[in-house]
Design a protein with these regions (language model features):
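Anionic group-transfer/hydrolysis microenvironments
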Residues: 5, 82, 109
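A short, small-residue-rich loop immediately preceding and capping a beta-strand
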Residues: 1-2, 134-137
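Thiolate-centered catalytic microenvironments shared by cysteine-dependent enzyme domains
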Residues: 1-68, 143-160, 166
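Short, charged, surface-exposed secondary-structure boundary motifs
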Residues: 35-38, 113-117, 170-173
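Active-site neighborhoods of enzymes that stabilize oxyanions during catalysis
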Residues: 32-101, 175-179
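Short coil/turn segments at beta-strand junctions that form active-site/ligand-binding loops
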Residues: 74-79, 131-134, 158
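Cysteine-dependent PTP/DSP-like catalytic domain, specifically the C-terminal lobe
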Residues: 161-179
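Helix-loop module immediately N-terminal to the HCX5R catalytic loop
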Residues: 104-135
């Protein structure tokens, strides 16, 4: 997968394929912009392919719904990949502003340096979390959260989920707690 927005869209594609247990999926770090800046070859015609049947199990270990998050507040590490202004409720983007209780704000842009994932050492210093922690990432619609999911996986975290509904769901459900 690749895109032109520092891996935000591509990361969601990779995560989604992992959810469907696709055996071989990856993301072009730096995206199409880096590829073309390096003057690498580009095709302009549609790729021809033969359809096939992929019958793999769904990997439910990497997805979360609001129920799991709500039941585990205070027991899991919740990472909000949105901007600080979204996290603080200044930019609400839902019926309510703020964030999920106990969430840590690590803006997904901090995963990147000049459009590429930071090296493992820099990412590890950003995510100073127990490697065995149960982690859920979220944002507004699970795109930025998927980028953070991949960053965490890149540096060896095993128990990471993306909350698919993210703030778009949580912030609009008036029965869910908000800080």
């Amino acid at each position: 997968f690749y895109d032109n927005v520092s891996g935000m869209l591509a990361a969601r594609g990779v995560w989604l394929c992992q959810y469907f247990s696709h055996p071989d999926v990856s993301m072009l770090d730096g995206g199409f912009t880096k590829w073309t800046n390096e003057k690498l070859s580009v095709e302009t015609e549609p790729t021809k392919y033969s359809p096939s049947n992929l019958t793999t199990p769904i990997d439910t270990s990497i997805i979360s719904g609001f129920e799991y998050v709500k039941e585990n507040i205070g027991k899991i590490t919740i990472i909000d990949a949105r901007s600080k202004d979204e996290f603080d409720g200044i930019i609400p983007r839902a019926a309510r502003g703020g964030h999920i209780p106990t969430a840590i704000n690590i803006d997904w842009n901090k995963n990147l340096e000049e459009g590429l994932f930071k090296n493992d050492e820099k990412l590890a210093s950003l995510y100073e979390i127990d490697k065995d922690a149960q982690i859920v990432t979220y944002c507004q619609g699970a795109y930025r959260a998927a980028n953070s999911f991949l960053a965490l996986k890149k540096i060896g975290f095993k128990n990471v989920k993306v909350y698919l509904g993210s703030w778009g769901e949580w912030g609009n459900n008036l029965e869910l707690p908000v800080e």
